[in-house]
């Protein structure tokens, strides 16, 4: 099983993730796009990195907004994998 990060580790890693928040042992970000098509194009760009990492975000699409949530379900909270995927997602335009 993957090791959970400590509260201190979570706080330190969250500092370098612009736009992400930590709530209830989950990382969240909401990205807003011009329209639905751009939102879907962004979501499609998440597929390859998530598959490569073997770590998949929860995604909610509402017209031009995409809410992404990361947590390691089998570990019951945040792990390094969540922050690694968040860093990758942050680089996708």
UniProtKB/Swiss-Prot annotation:
Keyword set includes Lyase: yes
GO molecular function, one term: 4-alpha-hydroxytetrahydrobiopterin dehydratase activity
Top-level EC class as recorded in UniProt: lyase
Domain of life from the UniProt record: Bacteria
CDD domains named among the record's database cross-references: PCD_DCoH (cd00488)
Keywords: Lyase
One GO term (biological process): tetrahydrobiopterin biosynthetic process
EC numbers for this chain: 4.2.1.96
UniProt catalytic activity: (4aS,6R)-4a-hydroxy-L-erythro-5,6,7,8-tetrahydrobiopterin = (6R)-L-erythro-6,7-dihydrobiopterin + H2O
Family: Belongs to the pterin-4-alpha-carbinolamine dehydratase family.
Name the record gives this protein: Putative pterin-4-alpha-carbinolamine dehydratase
């Amino acid at each position: 099983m993957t090791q959970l990060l400590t509260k201190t580790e979570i706080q330190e890693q969250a500092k370098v993730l612009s736009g992400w928040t930590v709530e209830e042992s989950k990382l969240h970000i909401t990205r807003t796009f011009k329209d639905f098509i751009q939102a879907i194009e962004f979501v499609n760009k998440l597929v390859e990195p998530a598959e490569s990492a073997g770590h998949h975000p929860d995604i909610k699409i509402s017209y031009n907004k995409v809410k992404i949530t990361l947590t390691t379900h089998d570990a019951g909270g945040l792990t390094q994998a969540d922050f690694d995927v968040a860093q990758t997602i942050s680089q996708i335009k």
